[in-house]
Structures are given as structure tokens and as C-alpha cells.
Design a protein with these regions (language model features):
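Interfacial loop-to-transmembrane junctions
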Residues: 90, 94, 425-446
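Short helix-coil transition sites and intra-membrane helix breaks within transmembrane domains
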Residues: 20-24, 60-63, 74-84, 110-123, ...
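Core transmembrane alpha-helical segments of multi-pass membrane transporters/permeases
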Residues: 26-29, 48-84, 109, 276-341
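Hydrophobic core segments of alpha-helical transmembrane domains in multi-pass membrane transport
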Residues: 6-18, 29-38, 67-72, 106-111, ...
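Re-entrant/interfacial helical elements at transmembrane boundaries that shape
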Residues: 71, 85-87, 119-131, 160-172, ...
Length: 464
């Protein structure tokens, strides 16, 4: 019992620190190693070097280029006036009252096209900030709006989504990304409808109080007022290019390099072997972002050139902060998952009798503890997938349903205050947990209820 309390105390400390605005880069190792100290004092050093730093550095190695290119792309979209051009067109066509659905739609299209959640946050923020400012919608609702579009139904519920949360279950259940399509569509509609209703209700309440976009805000878009705005079709072209090329490169890269690639250079003592399958998605989004950056520079250089040096420095600083925040969370999750309290908790969750509820609760709780949807789901399925499969066969539950429930459950409690994506999104928007986390939490609750709704729908109708 004490081991469980230690693990949960570390989690509570990190969540409290994140909510109060303390640096997660500092408090993630403090919380993780504090738990190790209380469990086995002699293991603190090895746990820090061999677990925390190993996972943290591994995350940076894989994903920092994505953070960097995403931040630069978003900054150029902002400086070029592309974001303001698209916002002006959206207001002309749809009116200011549809600002929230427009941002949700843009985020959804990008994530369903395979663009990383982190990249979407960087790329969409300039549009969202400009549109919300002109529409008089509080800036504090931007993170929840982006979360609804990028961190919810297109992440793991919508059939066919290429996001990793929808791919992980395939290796455990022998399914594919289109598993349980009707349940996925039903869950997606549940999230979209109730998410938009909640956001619009918050907007109306803010209007009634006379609350506008806000003042004295940080990380505001810096598009100068004296530039000529490009045509909206030119402005939206880089976003479409990134989404399209990301999809194409995902298919092309394995064809170019094969299953693995050996790098041989005169100065190397031995060849560097890369397993292409594991890195394809990352290379694809990097190539797509580079192409998008080049297109923005070509089409908008006249507006960008005077602010390129300053803007690029700001983008690099933002990318470093966002990547290190998320990497620290990754290290924290690795340490906590190795503690005896975590194993006790995992075994306790396995005792839940209903197979779908067992899977949903196990995945979402472990995702919440580790602060990672993919991490929590991987741990849960690695430990319990055989049990889930046996129980599903005994209850005549198709494995496709297990896939969809696991994927959707991973995106529930993973958005607690210490989650890396949440911290990154707040850092990009220049908002604190106190200002904006309430909205993200509301989307989290809706997302969690959607999983229960999908389970109930299956049991009542048998639809898959």
C-alpha cells in the first residue's frame, strides 16, 4: 500500500507544480527521484541516469527536430501575414460567430492528415489567436479549442487516423487503423457535439460578463499592421502542402530506403543502421514541414525578411522549452512505471471483471499516471493484452472493439495538468494552467465520457 501512495504522491506533486506554474523541467526529476528515494535510496543515481535521462534524451533525439520545424513554420505563418489573411477570409465567409468551429476543423484536418499534435499546436496558434482576437473570444479558450480539434477525436476515435494512439493497438490485437469504424464514428460525434456545445457556452458566458479577448497577454502573434496580406488561397497553401506531403512521404520513405538503411561514411568506424519503419512518421513530418517552410519563405519573403532573425530566435526558444517540458514528462513516466507501486496498481486494475471497462479504466489510469496517452496504453497493453483478448473471446467481443476502446481511453486522463502536450500547448499560447487548464479538463471529461458511451453503445446494439 505504501508503494502505491509513494507513486501517487509523486504524481500529485508534479501536477500541483505544473498547475501553479513551476517548471516541469525542474519538478519532473524531483518528483520522480523523490519517489525512488522513498522506495530504494540506493537506486536514485542509477534511476536518474539509466531511466529518467535515458528516456528524456531519447525523446529529444527523436522529436526535437519536429518541435523546431513546427515552431519555425508557425512563426513564419505569423510573420508573413498568412494567418491574418486566412482569418480575414474565414470571417468574410463564415462570420465571426463560427470562429471556434473553424479552428476545431483546421486542427482536425491536420491531425487526421497525419500531422503531429505538437506541430498542429504550433501551426494553428497564429490563426486561432488572430481569429479569436477579431471575434472578441477570450484567448483562454484557445487551448481547449485546439485540444478538441487535435487531442481528442482525430487522435484516437476517428477510424483510420494515423496518430500513434490509433496504431499501437494494432500490434496487440491484430487489427488495423480502421478497427470498429461505427463505434469510432459514434464516439467522434459524441466528442464533437458536446465539445462544441461546451466551448460555445463558455463563449456566451464570457460575452454576458463583457469579457473580450484579453489584455496584457504573452506570446501574441506579431503580424505587422502595415503589410499587404496575400490571397487566402496562397496563405492556406502551406498548411495543405504540409498535410499532403506528410501523407505522401509516409508512403514514399519506406520505398526509398527499404526496411532498414546503413549509413557508411569514411569517418565512421562502423555503419549506422536505421530501422526505417520506426522513424518513417518522424522523417515524413520533418520533410513536410521543411517543404512548408520553403513555400512560406518563397511566397511571403517580402513581409518576413525584416523580422526573420528575431522571429527565428523566438521560434527556436519556444521549441526548446516545449521539447524539454515534454521530454521531462517522458522521463518522469518511465521512472514511475518502474516503481513497485505502479505494478501494484496495474494488478489491481486487472481485477475489474468487465473486459471493456477493465481495459478502458486500466489504459486511462496508466496514461494519467505516466502523463502520456501512448506511454500509458503501451504499458497497459504490454502487461494485460493477453488477458483482455481471452476475456473478449469468452464474452464474444470482437477484437476490433478492444482496439477502439483502448485507443479512445488513452486520450482520457492523459491530459492531466502534468501531461507534456498540455504543457506544450499552454507554453505555445502563452497561458498558464490557472488561466486555461479548466477548458482542457472539460474536454478531457467529455472525452472520457465518450469511451463509456461507446462501450454502452456496443453492449446495447452490438454495432462495431
Amino acid at each position: 500500500m505504501m508503494s502505491v501512495i509513494i507513486a501517487l504522491a509523486a504524481l500529485a506533486l508534479l501536477m500541483l507544480a505544473a498547475y501553479r506554474g513551476y517548471s516541469v523541467i525542474l519538478f519532473a526529476p524531483i518528483a520522480a527521484l523523490g519517489a525512488v528515494l522513498l522506495t530504494d535510496p540506493g537506486a536514485v543515481g542509477p534511476a536518474f541516469t539509466g531511466l529518467f535521462m535515458e528516456k528524456m534524451v531519447g525523446f529529444v533525439k527523436l522529436y526535437f527536430p519536429v518541435f523546431l520545424l513546427g515552431a519555425v513554420f508557425g512563426k513564419l505563418i505569423e510573420l508573413s501575414g498568412f494567418s491574418r489573411s486566412i482569418v480575414a477570409a474565414a470571417i468574410r465567409i463564415l462570420g465571426r460567430r463560427h470562429a471556434i468551429p473553424v479552428i476545431v476543423l483546421v486542427c482536425a484536418l491536420l491531425t487526421y492528415g497525419g500531422v503531429s499534435l505538437f506541430v498542429v499546436a504550433f501551426a494553428v496558434y497564429p490563426f486561432a489567436a488572430e481569429l479569436f482576437r477579431q471575434s472578441g473570444i477570450p484567448k483562454r479558450l484557445i487551448p481547449a479549442t485546439v485540444a478538441l480539434g487535435a487531442f481528442s477525436f482525430t487522435m484516437d476515435a476517428l477510424p483510420g487516423t494515423p496518430q500513434i494512439q490509433n496504431i499501437i493497438p494494432t500490434s496487440f490485437f491484430g487489427t488495423n487503423a480502421w478497427a470498429a469504424p461505427w463505434l469510432g464514428l459514434i464516439g467522434s460525434l459524441f466528442i464533437i457535439i458536446f465539445g462544441l456545445l461546451w466551448l460555445e457556452r463558455q463563449h456566451r458566458k464570457a460575452q454576458a460578463r463583457g469579457e473580450g479577448y484579453g489584455t496584457d497577454l504573452q506570446n501574441e502573434p506579431e503580424t505587422p499592421d502595415d503589410i499587404d496580406l496575400p490571397h487566402p488561397l496562397i496563405a492556406i497553401a502551406p498548411l495543405l502542402l504540409v498535410g499532403g506531403l506528410n501523407l505522401l512521404f509516409t508512403h514514399w520513405i519506406p520505398q526509398w530506403y527499404g526496411a532498414s538503411h546503413e549509413l557508411t561514411l569514411p569517418g565512421l568506424a562502423k555503419p549506422v543502421v536505421t530501422e526505417v519503419g520506426k522513424i518513417t512518421a518522424i522523417w515524413a513530418v520533418q520533410a513536410a514541414l521543411l517543404s512548408g517552410i520553403v513555400l512560406v519563405l518563397v511566397c511571403g519573403y517580402r513581409n518576413i525578411r525584416g523580422r526573420l532573425a528575431e522571429g527565428s530566435r523566438t521560434a527556436v526558444g519556444g521549441a526548446i522549452l516545449a521539447a524539454m517540458n515534454t521530454a521531462s514528462e517522458y522521463g518522469f513516466g518511465a521512472v514511475i512505471a518502474a516503481l513497485p507501486g505502479f505494478l501494484v496498481l496495474s494488478k489491481a486494475l486487472a481485477a475489474i471483471p468487465n473486459p471493456l471497462l477493465n481495459e478502458a479504466i486500466s489504459v486511462t489510469v496508466l496514461a494519467g499516471i505516466t502523463g502520456s496517452a501512448s506511454g500509458g496504453m503501451s504499458i497497459a497493453l504490454a502487461a494485460m493484452s493477453e488477458t483482455f483478448v481471452a476475456a473478449a473471446h469468452a464474452a464474444n467481443i470482437p477484437l476490433e472493439v478492444l482496439h477502439r476502446v483502448a485507443a479512445m481511453a488513452s486520450g482520457g486522463m492523459d491530459t492531466l495538468p502534468h501531461n507534456g502536450a498540455v504543457i506544450t500547448l499552454l507554453a505555445i499560447t502563452g497561458l498558464s494552467h490557472r488561466q486555461a487548464y479548466g477548458g482542457i479538463f472539460a474536454i478531457t471529461v467529455i472525452k472520457s465520457l465518450a469511451v463509456l458511451f461507446v462501450i454502452a453503445t456496443f453492449y446495447v446494439t452490438g454495432i462495431v
